[in-house]
Amino acid sequence: VLLHAGAGLLQGAMGIHGAFVAGVPMVVISGESMTYGEQPEFDPGAQWINNLSIAGGTTHLVDSIVKYTSVAGSVHTLYESVVRAGELAQRQPTGPTYLSVSTETLMDSWTPPANPRAVPPAPRMLTAPEDIEKLAAQIAKAKHPVVLTEGAGQEVETYEALVALCDKFALPVVEKPGALFANFPKDHP
């Protein structure tokens, strides 16, 4: 997600916070001018020094609603910074990360690295088999088991597995009023 300077970052703060609460992985990038027209042959415009600069940089605007903040200071560190922010966004618990990338860096010429490192797929967190067995035993012993949902709908596979489990054992489902996702079909018998 590319947002405009501090102003766009603040306008996007509610969406970023929602992603943080819901555990939605994303990389958010914005930045500001670092040279304010003093860099030869690069004039970002007068609006930067007058209206768009944030004292101390933009990272502190969102550091409480993202997992990680950093500054990509040049085109030489940009690729690896984006990869790292993406990896961190996808690691458990998932959520948004933020990179401050200056206008000068965004506008600079970039050559991809000759040998970019292979980016591994995001790790998946799986429940230990012994925990699944414990849960199955608890459900089997319960006289009137009920499933309470909150965040199962984030992944299609989890959603479908929950429906199949509840169908197989005729388990009633209650969705928490503040559920983060659609966790169970509303029209399910």
Show which residues each predicted segment covers:
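N-terminal alpha/beta PP-like core and its mobile active-site loop of ThDP/TPP-dependent enzymes
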Residues: V1-P189
